[in-house]
UniProtKB/Swiss-Prot annotation:
It comes from Rickettsia rickettsii (strain Sheila Smith). Belongs to the class-I aminoacyl-tRNA synthetase family. Glutamate--tRNA ligase type 1 subfamily. A motif ('KMSKS' region) lies at residues 240-244. Keywords: Aminoacyl-tRNA synthetase, ATP-binding, Cytoplasm, Ligase, Nucleotide-binding, Protein biosynthesis. Its EC number is 6.1.1.17. Catalyzes the attachment of glutamate to tRNA(Glu) in a two-step reaction: glutamate is first activated by ATP to form Glu-AMP and then transferred to the acceptor end of tRNA(Glu). One of its GO terms (cellular component) is cytoplasm. It catalyses: tRNA(Glu) + L-glutamate + ATP = L-glutamyl-tRNA(Glu) + AMP + diphosphate. The keyword Zinc does not apply. This is Glutamate--tRNA ligase 1.
Length: 447
């Protein structure tokens, strides 16, 4: 059996967002499940927009998610190889020189659209005589090159979409070499996939028409194409998510919002599939349950609040030995197991534990909360004597009810506000033993 080799090929022209991290996750998981290899390739032929800082940020995000690669390379290191294939395809008459300026091409496109026609290149340059081409060169025009798409049926079996069929006549010959000599994504990608023995490619369905053209490129290079799977697009409020329109960046999710790595990995590797989205604790366990056949063809709706709920579920499922290492990463190694177990059931983000440590160890500011001071002083007098335990809350509130007649929110909300300055959070029964008894009385009587 052929060894499974997948790849993820981001362009270092921006930060990773939830759309392309999904492709990275699924390619990694597919390779992992089949004991294969995963290759990281940087499509950096866009010289104007590609930046080292984006490459570094992409690698940082992947490492955070425990997406490790067996090999990595960038396309700029392979220009001589691409040039050799360019010459081969020119000899085979599958590449041809074009001399239109960007402005001329835009006019053609607008004219076609105004007539209700698809903006397919008219192959005007394919029919140029040598004299006409020479005249353009004398004018100082530099040629760009297009791949000649044969006007014949194209089909393949897609891992997600099933049978996909295209008519070559409906596809425009793509530009594969720009006028400045730089290569575009289309042909370089095929050459790389051939040279690195890529067997499976999972990517967004916005690449389906590209795949149809690339099928002919593989054929032109006498190679069997990889097996493709095209994921439905992730949408949020009826818009496709992409980095060019301000998609949700992974760096933002992990650094600013505080989502755990395995929450991100679990969520986006299961989103759009028939599998239940659960908070897996390791990439290995996630890979074991991964099934590419479970993914839907329909658009996938991403709701950030669903990810935050999953993050909460993950946090409360973690044992303290696991949490200890994460606490070091956020400079909170002073948190002990007892404190963690007391507050973790209500944490939304790991960093929230630092806030609750501060609340329990420093008197909060409640000056602007307009609390009922008489009630709080009365409650302080009724606080059970001796050591404060988890049972103290129920004993205390029963006594308060007996004396004041207060119940429910009228009883507990003023106490919560006076003790924590928060309307919500961990159960007060759990928080109470974390605060020194004298401090509890101080907070109640000075509110």
């Amino acid at each position: 059996m052929t060894k499974v080799i997948t790849r993820f090929a981001p362009s270092p022209t921006g930060m990773l967002h939830v759309g392309n991290i999904r492709a990275a996750l699924l390619n990694w998981l597919y390779a992992k499940k089949h004991n294969g290899q995963f290759i990281l390739r940087f499509d950096d032929t866009d010289l104007e927009r590609s930046k080292q800082e984006y490459k570094d940020a992409i690698e940082e995000d992947l490492k955070f998610l425990n997406i490790n690669w067996d090999q990595t390379f960038n396309q700029l290191s392979r220009l001589s190889r691409y040039d050799a294939i360019k010459n081969l395809l020119l000899d085979k008459k599958r590449l041809y020189a074009c001399y239109e300026t960007p402005e001329e091409l835009e006019l053609k496109r607008k004219f076609q659209l105004s007539k209700g026609l698809p903006p397919i290149y008219d192959r005007a340059s394919l029919n140029l005589t040598e004299e006409q081409a020479k005249k353009y060169i004398e004018q100082g025009r530099k040629p760009h090159y297009r791949f000649l798409v044969n006007h014949e049926p194209i089909s393949w079996h897609d891992m997600i979409k099933g049978e996909v069929k295209y008519d070559g006549k409906a596809l425009s010959d793509p530009i594969v070499i720009r006028a400045d000599g730089s290569m575009t994504y289309m042909l370089c990608s095929v050459i790389d996939d051939i040279d690195y023995d890529i067997t499976h490619i999972i990517r967004g369905e916005d690449h389906v028409s590209n795949t149809a053209i690339q099928m002919q490129m593989f054929e032109a290079l006498n190679t069997t194409p990889p097996t493709f799977g095209h994921l439905s697009l992730i949408i949020n409020k009826d818009e496709k998510i992409s980095k060019r329109v301000g998609g949700f960046e992974i760096a933002t999710l992990r650094k600013e919002i505080g989502i755990e790595a395995m929450a991100i990995a679990s969520f986006f590797s299961l989103l759009g599939s028939s599998a239940q989205i659960l908070p897996y604790k390791s990439m290995e366990k996630l890979a074991n349950q991964f099934e590419i056949s479970s993914f839907s063809k329909s658009p996938t709706i991403y709701q950030p609040e669903d990810l935050e709920r999953l993050n909460h579920k993950l946090l409360i499922s973690l044992d303290f030995d696991t949490v200890k290492e994460r606490l070091k990463e956020i400079d909170a190694e002073y948190i002990d197991e007892n404190f963690w177990l007391s507050v973790s059931p209500n944490l939304q983000k790991l960093r929230d534990v630092k806030d609750w440590w501060e609340i329990c160890h420093q008197t909060p500011n409640v000056e602007n909360l307009n609390l009922d001071k008489e009630y709080l002083k009365q409650a302080a007098e009724l606080l059970p004597k001796g050591e404060i335990t988890k049972d103290s809350w129920s004993i205390w509130t029963k006594e308060i009810t007996n004396i004041t007649g207060r119940k429910g929110k009228e009883l507990f909300l003023p106490l919560r506000l006076a003790l924590t300055a928060r309307e919500s959070g961990p159960e007060i029964a759990s928080v109470l033993p974390l605060i020194d008894r004298e401090e509890i009385i101080k907070r109640l009587t000075s509110a």
